[in-house]
Swiss-Prot record:
EC number: 7.1.2.2
Lineage summary: Bacteria, Bacillati, Bacillota, Bacilli, Lactobacillales
Subunit record text: F-type ATPases have 2 components, CF(1) - the catalytic core - and CF(0) - the membrane proton channel. CF(1) has five subunits: alpha(3), beta(3), gamma(1), delta(1), epsilon(1). CF(0) has three main subunits: a(1), b(2) and c(9-12). The alpha and beta chains form an alternating ring which encloses part of the gamma chain. CF(1) is attached to CF(0) by a central stalk formed by the gamma and epsilon chains, while a peripheral stalk is formed by the delta and b chains.
Entry similarity comment: Belongs to the ATPase alpha/beta chains family.
Catalysed reaction equations from the record: ATP + H2O + 4 H(+)(in) = ADP + phosphate + 5 H(+)(out)
Binding site for ATP: G169, D170, R171, K172, T173, G174, K175, T176
Swiss-Prot/TrEMBL keywords: ATP synthesis, ATP-binding, Cell membrane, CF(1), Hydrogen ion transport, Ion transport, Membrane, Nucleotide-binding, Translocase, Transport
CDD domains attached to this UniProt entry: ATP-synt_F1_alpha_C, ATP-synt_F1_alpha_N, F1-ATPase_alpha_CD
Source species of the chain: Lacticaseibacillus paracasei (strain ATCC 334 / BCRC 17002 / CCUG 31169 / CIP 107868 / KCTC 3260 / NRRL B-441)
Topology with respect to the bilayer: Peripheral membrane protein
Site (Required for activity): S362
Protein name stated in the entry: ATP synthase subunit alpha
Its biological purpose: Produces ATP from ADP in the presence of a proton gradient across the membrane. The alpha chain is a regulatory subunit.
Origin superkingdom: Bacteria
Length: 509
């Protein structure tokens, strides 16, 4: 039997042609320390900052400290099964979360995994949680209003699309209520909302989700929650994950509102991680880069240039103060990063002025350019009037006799405070806000007793809906104040037939 060498060589060639290289080079390290949501590993010399690393039990971590001898890793999720000596390997990917339309209406955790029991989220799009903020030339000036539906904000501290407006105040002063009401008011406004709950009790988040469902707001909202029972890394990455979800829509030319509730808890979790990773502590034991932690997050909110699609992301970060101290480290940091702040005072809140906005300490640095023209006209001096009223009110407590002009100022001030009060979850459309503020600033409310102001307002809105819907439509469509003679005539017609509580009581008797 003779073996033909040609056949053998052709067979070998065929085999070589069909050969597939299944070898994959992996960089694997060894865990040297594990505990408190932190791991240290050696042997990962080429790991990138914020790279996703996988442990042998399937858990993931993120490289946060890149040191000479080892890597400091924050563990995302359960770390009970990880032991010293376990293997950890590089994935070559930066930490990413799922994004896209499929996320809308869902409640997810910091990794984008659903926690609402409604099954898997069908999306194949992802975005890195850390992303470079748009540069100067990629942005555009804030020019479109973002209506919150709250008279006190839309009149005194207006917000524009693409702005960063801080909501700051002590605990239990209505910070979350303002954020939720703003989300509720975005219905039919072509906005997508992202609510990031950081360190909020699960029962509280459940209540917020139920509120959003009740008013139909979950149709355009993503809720991201990192509860207090979760490890610190989950709380730390939550706002960045939320920003990534919002950016997906912004870079596709859509408008996004994102609420970070609240960044004080995120700062605390980052301080915890930094101390565990042996980073040198600074003021109030926060690490040296705590300012950068918040600035790189909030700079991602922007109004993009027309070249990039003209989308926007408006950020409402929330900060909790201790005993009204806005000069503490984190509050001053975030105040200096944002384009203004809404300061809520507990004294006002307990006195029944809700939303409890301190007009003197609250400011919007860029929102005035975006304010509706009609609102600008009727609310132009409102902030100054309110601030001077507060001063006068303090002065009159000494019991001195007042001249007629001062008395008139006080009366107008008290009515202003009453008009700016608003029940929770009842946002008002801008045209109705303009009507009541016009009535206030033009003296139509001066003869009305304070206890009847709310009823006067509600009945005035009903009157306009029935008899002057064209004026409301004009404000809504054009943003301009209609003919003042027509407006005055309608308000006078209503005020002439309005009966005060005393008149109603007398009529009954």
């Amino acid at each position: 039997m003779s073996i033909k060498t040609e056949e053998i060589s052709s067979l070998i060639k065929k085999q070589l042609e069909g050969y597939q290289d299944d070898l994959a080079a992996e960089e694997v390290g060894t865990v040297t320390y594990i505990g408190d949501g932190i791991a240290r590993a050696t042997g990962l010399e080429n790991a990138m900052a914020n790279e996703l690393l996988q442990f042998s039990n399937g858990s993931y971590g993120m490289a946060l400290n890149l040191e000479t001898n080892d890597v400091g890793i924050i563990i995302l999720g359960d770390f009970d099964e990880i032991r010293e000596g376990d293997q950890v390997k590089r994935t070559g990917r930066i930490m990413e979360v799922p994004v896209g339309d499929a996320m809308i209406g869902r409640v997810v955790n910091s990794l984008g995994q659903p926690v609402d029991g409604l099954g898997a989220i069908k999306t194949d799009k992802t975005r890195p949680i850390e992303f470079k903020a748009p540069g100067v030339m990629q942005r555009k000036s804030v020019s479109e209003p973002l209506q919150t539906g709250l008279k006190a904000i839309d009149a005194l501290v207006p917000i524009g699309r693409g702005q960063r407006e801080l909501i700051i105040g002590d605990r239990k002063t209505g910070k979350t209520s303002i954020a939720i009401d703003t989300i509720l008011n975005q219905k039919d406004q072509n906005m997508i909302c992202v609510y990031v709950a950081i360190g909020q009790k699960d029962s509280t988040v459940r209540a917020q989700v139920e509120t959003l469902k009740k008013y139909g707001a979950m149709d355009y909202t993503i809720v991201l929650t990192a509860g207090p029972s979760e490890p610190a890394p989950m709380l730390y990455i939550a706002p960045y994950a939320g920003a990534a979800m919002g950016e997906e829509f912004m870079y596709n030319g859509k408008h996004v509102l994102i609420v970070y509730d609240d960044l004080s808890k995120q700062a605390t979790s980052y301080r915890e991680l930094s101390l565990l990773l042996r980073r040198p502590p600074g003021r109030e034991a926060y690490p040296g880069d705590i300012f950068y932690t918040h600035s790189r997050l909030l700079e991602r909110a922007a109004k993009l240039s027309d070249k990039l699609g003209g989308g926007s992301m408006t950020a409402l970060p929330v900060i909790e103060t201790q005993a009204g101290d806005i000069s503490a480290y984190i509050p001053t940091n975030v105040i200096s990063i944002t384009d203004g702040q809404i300061f809520l005072q507990s004294d006002l809140f307990y006195a029944g002025t809700r939303p409890a906005i301190d007009a003197g300490a609250s400011v919007s640095r860029v929102g005035g350019d975006a304010q509706v023209k009609a609102m600008k006209k009727v609310a132009g001096t409102l902030r100054l009037d309110l601030a001077s009223f507060r001063e006068l009110e303090a002065f009159t407590q000494f019991g001195s006799d007042l001249d007629a002009a001062t008395q008139a100022k006080l009366n107008r001030g008290r009515r202003t405070v009453e008009v700016l009060k608003q029940p929770v979850h009842k946002p008002l459309p801008v045209e109705k806000q303009v009507i009541i503020l016009y009535a206030l600033t033009h003296g139509f409310l001066d003869p009305i007793p304070i206890e009847d102001i709310t009823r006067f307002q509600d009945e005035l809105f009903d009157f306009f809906d029935s008899n002057a819907a064209d004026l409301l439509k004009q404000i809504r469509d054009t943003g301009n104040l209609p003919d003042t003679d027509k407006l005055d005539a309608q308000i006078k017609a209503f005020a002439g037939g309005f009966q005060t509580s005393k008149q109603l009581a007398a009529a009954k008797d």
